[in-house]
Curated annotation (Swiss-Prot):
This is Ferredoxin-like protein YgcO. It comes from Escherichia coli (strain K12). SUPFAM superfamilies: 4Fe-4S ferredoxins. Residues 45-74 form the 4Fe-4S ferredoxin-type domain. The lineage of its organism: Bacteria, Pseudomonadati, Pseudomonadota, Gammaproteobacteria, Enterobacterales. Gene3D superfamilies: 3.30.70.20. Belongs to the bacterial-type ferredoxin family. FixX subfamily. GO terms for biological process: DNA-mediated transformation.
Amino acid sequence: MSVARNLWRVADAPHIVPADSVERQTAERLINACPAGLFSLTPEGNLRIDYRSCLECGTCRLLCDESTLQQWRYPPSGFGITYRFG
């Protein structure tokens, strides 16, 4: 599947928000596992999430506990990814 065919309509507010403090080991697990590459560390060592390219697959929810992500929900109706196969 080519992700170039998929369409994103980005919401103004993020649907994934990291906790204020995330263990480095958990952050590295998210950085390595996210298929969209949304996660990175800031120079200060904080977890950064670029929610705009999210595939809404839920991998991050499976890899961490509820204390890692302050918020995870699907984008509002009409926003997020639209998969286009072909």
